[in-house]
């Protein structure tokens, strides 16, 4: 049996799932995992109950925008269950033998984390559904008239599936998950807690005002907050400062072309395109994405959640529309018979 709490990756392509440079900042236990209070409280109860019964935790489905900690939480779940975890993503399963090798190599009560689970191939999904429900695996040996099906027992394991597109997960697969949780964008207060905790890990002090300014520019996403914190730390180091001040954060954000609302250059390009090319909308997501050189998936997964949360874009049945707040932010005049551009904000 493998060591408890071990973390293994099933492909070198999983770097985006668990960046080693970010590993030192990842919380290892629930106590250090900031935000997502309801998710943590619910999971804590289910984990405790499973441990008291000496059973594997039921399968867990995690959804929400990227960068909110789904992979990190999966590792924490494994830690709390005293179990090993294997981390992979749906595109890594190309053929049935890929999933067979992984499932047969699992330990009792171990955790298998699959990111982008909505991208599973149908034949892989069918095999996984059987494994999740019956803890058995049907394996076809031979071909043609000589083919026969061998049923292999599997250990009682926990599958944690994560996705940014829960609507694309099929009903049969979704029904196999006994626990579901949705991640929401973090509040500024929660991000401040994360930034202050991680600044200590990075051996740099940060002032309260500076932490709030950094949090306000992090799009409600811990991954972005951590990335910005590292870059601001670089600036503080080069300028000879032992403390990150609000002035240093402002310098860093200006260098990175991030404005006071946390919008970067591409965010502003999206708003400008929506207003200037499509008269404020409504316009379909595919058309809007093409106009700014993005895919519809990246627009919906990365940019839209924050722009909608901040009130810059509204989503209607006819498409995306720019709000009055978007016009004000870009210093554009909103008129019923068209638009006059008064002055663009320069960054």
Curated annotation (Swiss-Prot):
Assigned keywords, A-Z: ATP-binding, Cytoplasm, DNA damage, DNA recombination, DNA repair, DNA-binding, Hydrolase, Nucleotide-binding
UniProt-annotated location(s): Cytoplasm
SMART domains: AAA
Any Pfam family matching the protein: AAA_lid_4
Sample GO molecular function, one term: ATP hydrolysis activity
EC supergroup of this enzyme: hydrolase
GO CC, alphabetical: cytoplasm; Holliday junction resolvase complex
Descriptive protein name: Holliday junction branch migration complex subunit RuvB
